[in-house]
């Protein structure tokens, strides 16, 4: 279960007296103790959202319905989802806030929760291939979620080329999950057998009235100076260490050092997607031959695919691209919140023509970047964002689009690698054949490439804005070519000694 903010669960008498002076006299109920407050990083994704920047985490599933007990019908699918959601409180929780709340919003149970508000059904146009599926999913990815309800939707897309398949697109707000938490949330709807019984229902965390939300928020707000007293020294120390690293050339790629590309620019409201799938055995073969990590291979695949795409359009930069990469700290952070991540910047050297040299350069650069990110620590970014509010981040979103990025984007793309299950899964009784993760676009970086493994396959999901990149299939189709290129040059490499899986 997600961790709540322990420091915001109890109010002092001074807080209650203050609120009473404002004329608020609702009783304190036991539900307050269970109320879960968003962390600053969770709330960041609410505050930064705009009509042209929906901040949702999505995945597209291709399902074989022949395994569904009793045979597939939309009604059976609806009933199965209803049972499974009862065992996952995260699906039934919505935002709650009040104008008197000085801290971030809270999660409370939706007393009026109904599956029909979240489950959608749509038919795929003929011929029902991957391009038709991508067109529908791109449209869905650009739609905002209703903040008055739990922040998720599921779309069942019927009418594919095969009668025994359906596609499902699950969309969850980034305030609810990060990549790892999203995979965990998805697992609540899966089983290892198609006829596995639905899990037992789990009670939610309850609700919170205006007094409870405001009083606990006042406590959290009042504690910020104490927290700031610890964050500032840690930040100063980090800056000093970074300066020393820079002198020795041991820093990650710097923000605003990225070259201009066609996918850097103002975002529109629409989204388009493309996807592809790779054999994990081939990915691991490259990893072992070069003695690098899976992450290194993923970056090398991106570099190769983007090199091919940019060359075809005559716009390949002479400098390496820069990607911002979310780094999960779920196992390192003791901070509350559902999003447990920090970020690092890594170079994507698409300008290097030799694939062997390219992957070696990537591995060396990633080692430095990960070491630098580890030195910064898993919680420093989280701690600073905790102090921000909707006013500050809203102002940032009004200012950032007017900053010229012609010569120096903060970064070119978002690149994420999410570990996935290595077993055959059944989604509400339907065999899961493929899974393609889709991340959000942020700032003026109009390209997100997210990969996730599933049962021996690596799903690659690509998201952009059609105002910047009207056709993404050139990027998607470059991934198999990039893998083939690495496999061919890896045949001449000795077995690597560094067989890492991360």
From Swiss-Prot:
**What is one Gene Ontology biological process annotated in the Swiss-Prot or TrEMBL record?**
triglyceride biosynthetic process
Q: What is its EC number?
A: 2.3.1.20
The source's domain of life comes to Bacteria
Instruction: Give the reaction(s) catalysed.
Output: an acyl-CoA + a 1,2-diacyl-sn-glycerol = a triacyl-sn-glycerol + CoA
GO-annotated cellular components: plasma membrane
Q: Name one GO molecular function term.
A: diacylglycerol O-acyltransferase activity
Among its keywords, does the record have Transcription? no
Instruction: Give, as in the UniProt entry, the pathway in which the protein acts.
Output: Glycerolipid metabolism; triacylglycerol biosynthesis
Gene3D superfamilies on file:
Chloramphenicol acetyltransferase-like domain
Q: Which UniProt keywords apply?
A: Acyltransferase, Glycerol metabolism, Lipid biosynthesis, Lipid metabolism, Transferase
* Top EC class for this record: transferase
Q: Which Pfam families match?
A: WS_DGAT_C, WS_DGAT_cat
Q: Where along the chain is the active site annotated? A: 174 (proton acceptor)
Matching entries from SUPFAM superfamilies are given as: CoA-dependent acyltransferases
The similarity comment for this entry is: Belongs to the long-chain O-acyltransferase family.
Q: What is this protein called?
A: Putative diacyglycerol O-acyltransferase MT1809
């Amino acid at each position: 279960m997600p961790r709540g903010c322990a420091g915001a669960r109890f109010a002092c008498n001074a807080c209650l007296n203050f609120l009473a002076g404002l004329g608020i006299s609702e009783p304190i109920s036991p539900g307050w103790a269970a109320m879960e407050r968003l962390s600053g990083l969770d709330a960041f994704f609410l505050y930064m959202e705009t009509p042209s920047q929906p901040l949702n985490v999505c995945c597209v599933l291709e399902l074989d319905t022949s395994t569904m007990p009793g045979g597939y019908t939309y009604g059976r699918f609806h009933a199965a989802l209803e049972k499974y959601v009862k065992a996952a409180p995260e699906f039934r929780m919505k935002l709650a806030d009040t104008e008197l709340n000085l801290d971030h919003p809270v999660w409370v149970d939706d007393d009026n929760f109904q599956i029909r508000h979240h489950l959608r059904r749509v038919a795929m146009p003929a011929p029902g291939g991957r391009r038709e599926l991508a067109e529908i999913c791109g449209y869905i990815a650009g739609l905002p979620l209703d903040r008055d309800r739990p922040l998720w939707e599921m779309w069942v897309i019927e009418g594919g080329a095969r009668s025994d398949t359906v596609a499902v697109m699950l969309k969850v707000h980034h305030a609810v999950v990060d990549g790892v938490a999203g995979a965990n949330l998805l697992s609540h709807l899966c089983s290892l057998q198609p006829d596995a019984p639905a899990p037992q229902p789990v009670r939610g965390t309850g609700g919170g009235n205006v007094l409870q939300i405001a009083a606990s928020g006042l406590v959290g707000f009042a504690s910020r100076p104490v927290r700031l007293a610890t964050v500032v020294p840690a930040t100063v120390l980090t800056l000093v260490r970074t300066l020393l690293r820079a002198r020795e050339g041991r820093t990650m790629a710097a923000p605003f050092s990225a070259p201009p590309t066609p996918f850097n620019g103002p975002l529109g409201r629409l989204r388009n997607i493309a996807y592809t799938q790779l054999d994990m055995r081939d990915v691991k073969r490259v990893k072992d031959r070069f003695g690098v990590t899976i992450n290194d291979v993923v970056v090398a695949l991106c570099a190769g695919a983007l090199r091919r795409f940019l060359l075809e359009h005559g716009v390949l930069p002479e400098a390496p691209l820069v990607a911002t990469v979310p780094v999960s700290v779920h196992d390192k952070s003791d901070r509350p919140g559902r999003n447990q991540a920090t970020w690092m910047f890594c170079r994507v050297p698409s300008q290097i023509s030799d694939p062997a040299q390219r992957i070696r350069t990537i591995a060396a650069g990633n080692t430095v970047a990960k070491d630098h990110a580890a030195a910064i620590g898993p919680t420093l970014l989280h701690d600073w964002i905790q102090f921000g509010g909707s006013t500050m981040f809203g102002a940032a979103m009004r200012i950032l689009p007017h900053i010229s990025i012609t010569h120096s984007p903060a970064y070119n793309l978002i690149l994420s690698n999410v570990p996935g299950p290595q077993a055959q899964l059944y989604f509400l009784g339907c065999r899961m054949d493929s899974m393609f993760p889709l991340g959000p676009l942020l700032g003026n970086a109009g390209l997100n490439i997210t990969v996730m493994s599933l049962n021996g396959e690596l799903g690659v999901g690509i998201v952009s804005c059609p105002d910047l990149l009207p056709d993404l299939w050139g990027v998607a189709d470059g991934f198999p070519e990039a893998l083939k290129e690495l496999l061919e040059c890896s045949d001449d490499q000795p077995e690597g000694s560094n067989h890492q899986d991360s």
